[in-house]
Amino acid sequence: MITPLQPREFFRGVWRGEGELRPHPLLRIFLPVQPFRFSCNVTWLSDSIWTVDDRFDFASGRVLKRRMFAELVAPDRIHVTADDMPGGADILLHERGFRFTPYYALGAHREGGRVYRLRCFDECTLDDRGFLHDTIRIYYRGLPVATMRIGPVDLGRDGAA
């Protein structure tokens, strides 16, 4: 199985999956659980730099698109930046997945609504079948507000579907 420690082979093609954004129980009165479909398209620009185009299609009809720029800065570390990710983050690679260093993301409650600076803790793990599972714990001013789970994500490899 190809692992994240082989970034040129691992981070490629189109990834697809489903997930949900699950607000903290105390917030569910105002914010319902939001299922979504996820796709990610990776385009390599050089031997060490690539773009990641993420798309989230929520059941409510809302569509969220973002582009990240990624650079391999060490054999086991990638640095990523995006317009909604002030300061970016590092991705630490290991054989069974990868995790982001804690990062800030800018998120709006509703389309065109107020933008909040959210602290995110993001971990991705590979299961034995080669599918990726991503869990993002989201905080606002130190308080937990939501957890986003994506997976299983089909990495588009032969035999993984």
Protein language model regions, located:
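Central antiparallel beta-sheet cores of small beta-barrel/beta-sandwich binding domains
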Residues: 18-113
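Amphipathic/hydrophobic helical signal segments and adjacent flexible N-terminal regions
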Residues: 1-51, 57-59, 131, 135-137, ...
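Beta-sheet ligand-binding and adhesion/scaffold domains
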Residues: 1, 76-161
